[in-house]
Amino acid sequence: MVVTWNRVKLLTECLTMLRAQTRRPDVVVVVDNASTDGSSDVIHTQFPEVDVVRLVRNAGGAGGFSAGLAEAVDVHEADLVWAMDDDTIPTETALAELLASFTAYGPGLGLVASRVVWTDGRDQPRNIPRDPGRASKADRRAAHAAGGRPIRTASFVSLLIEAGAIRKYGLPTADFFIWNDDFEFTARLLRHAKGIYAPKAVVVHKTAELGTKLVDPGERFYNEVRNKIWVFRAGEAFGPLEAGVRVGAAMRNWALFYRHSRDQAAMRSGFKMGLRDGLRTRPRSTREVLAEAGYDLAAHW
């Protein structure tokens, strides 16, 4: 399942490599976030086997992944969903390796995260899944036997997600739009289920440059602040103690973002508005957000 917005060239590369998998996906779903570059037409012409979900307005990555996971689970009755961005270019064995790790682990596994590298083979720092820290010896042994290690959160760049976990713990929160939607979703799911990082399942995250943890968010700092506050206020992704630790880490990161920003005025504005909206509001229901984008969720969500 791929979410796209106005990156038809990268999307074409992504879909071409999905076709080239040694173990091809049974079904491919693309959520087109109201692209204006002809993405849907290109898919219909070059990849007629793909199920295209075209939204009438851009719902952001959060809305796109919510709609795509629902489509895969409800319409196609998937057992496992491989979710990714449109600038994710999988290596030929990526899916086979994800499935091998999932099968080797056994019951209780909610998701498997890929190793994400840049075009030169170096790891993308922002896409290295976080270790749970307090994982038990048994969990670490099970992850090691499956060729990986335990994780607490991961990114939507490339995730294999068990459908039962999606049904049980819910879809991503669509109202996040961008930033922290994958952080919240995977943390919520992995508060209850298990997750592992599978380093043999390699994908290329074809960004313009190698990412760093000190990315300058600019105006998107609003989404970073508001959404992080929403995550910690909701209480579904983290318990009180873990949330306290994460809040401290977030504040340290915000200070670093600000220090390295090229537009600190925009950062200050984004922080003030994000703080205000994060404390005064809560996310709208995913059903409401997707309905505005032209996608109707099934009643059970």
Features from the language model and the residues they span:
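Short beta-strand-to-loop acidic/aromatic patch adjacent to the donor-nucleotide binding site
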Residues: E77-D87
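Conserved donor nucleotide-binding strand/loop of the catalytic core
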Residues: S40-G63, A67-V75
